[in-house]
Curated annotation (Swiss-Prot):
Misc remark: SULT1C3 gene appears to be present only in humans and other primates.
Enzyme Commission code(s) on record: 2.8.2.1, 2.8.2.2
Protein name: Sulfotransferase 1C3
GO MF annotations in UniProt: 3'-phosphoadenosine 5'-phosphosulfate binding; alcohol sulfotransferase activity; aryl sulfotransferase activity; bile-salt sulfotransferase activity
Protein's organism: Homo sapiens (Human)
Lineage of origin: Eukaryota, Metazoa, Chordata, Craniata, Vertebrata
Major place of residence: cytoplasm
Pfam families: Sulfotransfer_1 (PF00685)
Record keywords: Cytoplasm, Lipid metabolism, Transferase
Group of enzyme by EC: transferase
Residues where 3'-phosphoadenylyl sulfate binds: 56-61, 139, 147, 202, 236-241, 264-268
Reaction(s) the record says it catalyses: an alcohol + 3'-phosphoadenylyl sulfate = an alkyl sulfate + adenosine 3',5'-bisphosphate + H(+); a phenol + 3'-phosphoadenylyl sulfate = an aryl sulfate + adenosine 3',5'-bisphosphate + H(+); lithocholate + 3'-phosphoadenylyl sulfate = lithocholate sulfate + adenosine 3',5'-bisphosphate + H(+)
Record-level GO BP terms: 3'-phosphoadenosine 5'-phosphosulfate metabolic process; cholesterol metabolic process; lipid metabolic process; sulfation; sulfur compound metabolic process; xenobiotic metabolic process
Length: 304
């Protein structure tokens, strides 16, 4: 059983809606030790599809792409509910829901699309045992850091980031919910050699969405027409999703996400980090990156 430490000291907290709990040293939003045991004991089915990401790496974007693929490009079906209510997060309970997402998963029939921010070593064993297909999306760490900072500012259930300088230090040391970005992307990169994992990059999807969506279709063994493919590309573009209340989270109460502080969907363009990092921070980040990623074959683009 993973080692659990509740309310680990990661960051100052706003009025609390989520507890921060360390699981094997990884800060998570797990409700309790008892709830973590339920997550660990989750029984996946072979046709369950898992979407795994580090926070702020394109989860909502990929969720919409997968939902449209699974619904053959039917736009109205994909507007049946807002993103958080269409498919569940394995380990989370959101403030606007009466019960944890896992309970919704257990009530629904397969096949299911299930989301998670867990690192690979904390994934319930049944997902590996049942050989579930997993789509993993990785985003370059500089843009991920900036996006995560703004998310902390606008989401009341996240710890107060204080300022960018302090958040930068905590992100670099892995003292944020989700843990170390470096460990997360490397862990899933290694796992892909042993399991059915399609490992995608945020920047690649942004640069050539058609090519990357075709990879997903092949992975899922799904055939669609060129017309439907183009429809999916259009409706999952940043500009369209930003205006779609079923994907931009504006239907949530401002007490949960305050878009007047920062919109959930801000820019979505690789390279925004350059508007925030100082020269010194960038140099420090690059040095730390080289150290932590030494020996890995993973490469990231910080702009396109």
């Amino acid at each position: 059983m993973a080692k659990i430490e509740k309310n680990a000291p990661t960051m100052e907290k706003k009025p609390e809606l989520f507890n921060i709990m360390e699981v094997d040293g990884v800060p998570t939003l797990i409700l309790s030790k008892e709830w973590w045991e339920k997550v660990c004991n989750f029984q996946a089915k072979p046709d369950d599809l898992i979407l795994a990401t580090y926070p702020k790496s394109g989860t909502t974007w990929m969720h919409e792409i997968l939902d449209m693929i699974l619904n053959d490009g039917d736009v109205e079906k994909c507007k049946r509910a807002q993103t958080l209510d269409r498919h569940a997060f394995l380990e989370l309970k959101f403030p606007h829901k009466e019960k944890p997402d896992l309970e919704f998963v257990l009530e629904m029939s397969s096949p299911q699309l299930i989301k998670t921010h867990l690192p690979s070593h904390l994934i319930p064993p049944s997902i590996w045992k049942e050989n579930c297909k997993i789509v993993y999306v990785a985003r370059n760490p500089k843009d991920c850091l900036v996006s995560y900072y703004h998310f902390h500012r606008m989401a009341s259930f996240m710890p107060d980031p204080q300022n960018l300088e302090e958040f930068y230090e905590k992100f670099m040391s892995g003292k944020v919910v989700g843990g170390s970005w470096f460990d997360h992307v490397k862990g899933w990169w290694a796992a892909k050699d042993m399991h059915r994992i399609l490992y995608l990059f945020y920047e690649d999807i942004k640069k050539d969405p058609k090519r990357e969506i075709e990879k997903i279709l092949k992975f899922l063994e799904k055939d669609i027409s060129e017309e439907i493919l183009n429809k999916i590309i259009y409706h999952t573009s940043f500009d369209v999703m930003k205006q779609n209340p079923m994907t931009n989270y504006t239907t949530l109460p401002t007490s949960i996400m305050d878009h007047s502080i920062s919109p959930f969907m801000r820019k979505g363009m690789p390279g925004d980090w350059k508007n925030y990092f100082t020269v010194a921070q960038n140099e420090e980040f690059d040095k730390d990156y080289q150290k932590k990623m030494a020996g890995s074959t993973l490469t990231f683009r910080t702009e396109i």
